[in-house]
């Protein structure tokens, strides 16, 4: 039977509960346990799919097509276990399910209330589908004291009483701020955070304390005394230079030992952390460096590109180099020459996005990369803009554009209306809702034999990648574009939807309709990112 670890946060938001959960999951996994990580999000949206990147950050897409919180990306990267739509739920989804049942008459006329109906729905979600796992780690989004989080805290309080004694523990992630004028770490915010947690019936078993310096023994003793936890359960979570150093740091601080002790499990062997040590050595001691320009439209919010940043880092690990990122707002190129911004970089990456703002700037970035032989990686929207650039400047289709931006006489990119998922035909219309109407999740793509991308993948002819898009390159222009050198080297198996384009006579120019960053892992870097960084490294030695 699975044991449950609930991770809560206090004092301030954005402390890194998702990263802490992922790191603990990796440590337990390194001890031979099977782990599952799940996330409860208290917001009222059904999912983050229609939320602004500036509000929410990245939308992480799973193989089964769920649009989820970016923390699920941390879970996958640290444990290697693919997440599913059953690993993330929001208040919105819970209320939708409850109200659907109420309209159907399932509650037989009962008054629907937060307790027991909402809390029971949360408990049912948390406790379902966990057979075969040793530990289930559940992160509760937000901060203790948030009004929208109260039903979730009540539900996890009840779960401890519902399950056998010793099958549930609570870990509270908190902040110890350093006050320079006083010259000390302050414990009072943590004390008040734990007081708030205890007032709703939850006594944390472990305090995970974010800090930028060692916790003195006296502060550790004070936290244990006033927060009612063992002194050994006050764990120091020091700031790290790399997120991949966190599992080793947490082990050194005793987190995994304390978790096992809380469950009365004897820690017989230390965790096998050799592979973590190996990649951290590569990160700390690179043999070179490359600079990649990310030409995007959400560059002011780095969390909007979280998986992308990590995938580039993985490419650097594979090539033993440091990857430096130069963030460029794509709108800049609509009024200025891109050369001064891009001449010094070793590679250009244009990521996914939606809407017309900044599109012309991305087209200019693709043109610069093509004309100057700079390695170019276009992802989703970045592929579409590269195709429009080729149509305008190589094929002579001056009015080439995307219908996403409005009516056009030359729709190089248009709205998909139907596609195959397995053997089933899925349909969409222009008038459909924005939420949940995209081509989402894992789909296969057939690669052309002998193409660059086929070689990058190891000479395979079919791959499976995750998608999140509503628009697609128009195959009516395929022949004209190929006549001018843009090769369609990957298509959907039925030959209807373009998946990959490339230039054969370019050092490295690949556009993909899918999101390869979502499947990259530190121990298994995605081949496209490894190859892209390798090409950037070659260029760095030429200029």
Swiss-Prot record:
Q: Provide the binding site for Mg(2+).
A: 71, 139
What are the recorded GO MF terms, alphabetically?
A: ATP binding; CTP synthase activity; glutaminase activity; identical protein binding; metal ion binding
Q: Where is the Glutamine amidotransferase type-1 domain?
A: 291-542
Family annotation (Gene3D superfamilies): 3.40.50.880, P-loop containing nucleotide triphosphate hydrolases (3.40.50.300)
EC numbers for this chain:
6.3.4.2
Q: Which domain of life is it from?
A: Bacteria
Q: Kindly state which reaction or reactions the protein catalyses.
A: UTP + L-glutamine + ATP + H2O = CTP + L-glutamate + ADP + phosphate + 2 H(+); L-glutamine + H2O = L-glutamate + NH4(+); UTP + NH4(+) + ATP = CTP + ADP + phosphate + 2 H(+)
Q: Which GO terms describe its cellular component?
A: cytosol
Q: Which residues bind CTP?
A: 13, 146-148, 186-191, 222
Matching entries from InterPro entries are given as: Class_I_gatase-like (IPR029062), CTP_synthase (IPR004468), CTP_synthase_N (IPR017456), GATASE (IPR017926), GATase1_CTP_Synthase (IPR033828), P-loop_NTPase (IPR027417)
Residues reported to bind ATP = 14-19, 71, 238-240
| UniProt cross-references to PROSITE patterns, sorted A to Z | GATASE_TYPE_1
Where's the active site on this chain? 380, 515, 517
Residues where UTP binds: 13, 186-191, 222
- Binding positions for L-glutamine per the UniProt entry: 54, 353, 381-384, 404, 470
Q: Where is this region: Amidoligase domain?
A: 1-265
Q: How is its activity regulated?
A: Allosterically activated by GTP, when glutamine is the substrate; GTP has no effect on the reaction when ammonia is the substrate. The allosteric effector GTP functions by stabilizing the protein conformation that binds the tetrahedral intermediate(s) formed during glutamine hydrolysis. Inhibited by the product CTP, via allosteric rather than competitive inhibition.
Miscellaneous comment as given in the Swiss-Prot or TrEMBL entry: CTPSs have evolved a hybrid strategy for distinguishing between UTP and CTP. The overlapping regions of the product feedback inhibitory and substrate sites recognize a common feature in both compounds, the triphosphate moiety. To differentiate isosteric substrate and product pyrimidine rings, an additional pocket far from the expected kinase/ligase catalytic site, specifically recognizes the cytosine and ribose portions of the product inhibitor.
Q: State the oligomer form and interacting partners.
A: Homotetramer.
Cited PANTHER family: CTP SYNTHASE, CTP SYNTHASE-RELATED
Q: Could you tell me what this protein does?
A: Catalyzes the ATP-dependent amination of UTP to CTP with either L-glutamine or ammonia as the source of nitrogen. Regulates intracellular CTP levels through interactions with the four ribonucleotide triphosphates.
Family in the record = Belongs to the CTP synthase family.
Q: What is this protein called?
A: CTP synthase
Species source reads: Rhodopseudomonas palustris (strain BisB5)
